[in-house]
């Protein structure tokens, strides 16, 4: 954003579009607008919001502070007591940023999509499937191409979601 403000031309996706994708609340709004199904989640800004979500949440949930890299301070918790314990232990890592809580889907498959977009058309180069079960941090996992266990419906859904998101976010690259 700072480079853009200084008049430096950046090729590819604009800093505004990147910020839109990185901002959890804005991204959630886009997901809802595009009618893309995702697990229940909460972007908790305070302890009260965490407790309120824990009353209605289906455990296990994946909790993590926003604005951290590499899976640091992420954890799967299985009940309200573990969630409260996590909040108190991770207070330093959160640095007054929201805590993200997502319903964790056990025995799920995780996929990565490589796609190119020119702002109008989307080309899916490949869909990779993680070898490990879906978990806390995908950055240290291994993938295979082509996927070893993906139905035609799941493939179609992934392509549809990727296309909708790339166009909505004005992805270029």
Protein language model annotation of sequence segments:
Residues 1-4:
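N-terminal glycine-rich "phosphate-gripper" loop used for MgATP/nucleotide binding
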Residues 8, 12-74:
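A conserved helix-loop-beta module that forms one wall/lid of the active-site cleft
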Residues 56-173:
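Internal nucleotide-binding/catalytic subdomain
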């Amino acid at each position: 954003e700072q480079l853009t403000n200084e008049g430096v031309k950046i090729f590819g996706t604009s800093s505004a579009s990147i910020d839109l994708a990185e901002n959890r609340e804005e991204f959630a709004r886009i997901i809802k607008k595009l009618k893309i199904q995702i697990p229940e989640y909460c972007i908790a800004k305070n302890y009260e919001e965490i407790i309120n979500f824990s009353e209605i949440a289906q455990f296990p949930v994946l909790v993590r502070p926003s604005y951290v890299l590499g899976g640091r301070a992420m954890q799967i918790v299985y009940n309200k007591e573990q969630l409260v314990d996590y909040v108190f232990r991770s207070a330093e890592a959160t640095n007054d940023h929201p805590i993200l809580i997502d319903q964790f889907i056990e025995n799920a498959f995780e996929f990565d999509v490589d796609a190119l977009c020119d702002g109008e058309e989307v080309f899916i180069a490949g869909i990779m499937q993680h070898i490990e079960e879906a978990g806390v941090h995908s950055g240290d996992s291994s993938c295979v191409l082509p996927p070893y266990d993906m139905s035609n419906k799941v493939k179609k859904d992934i392509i549809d979601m990727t296309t909708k998101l790339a166009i909505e976010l004005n992805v270029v690259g």
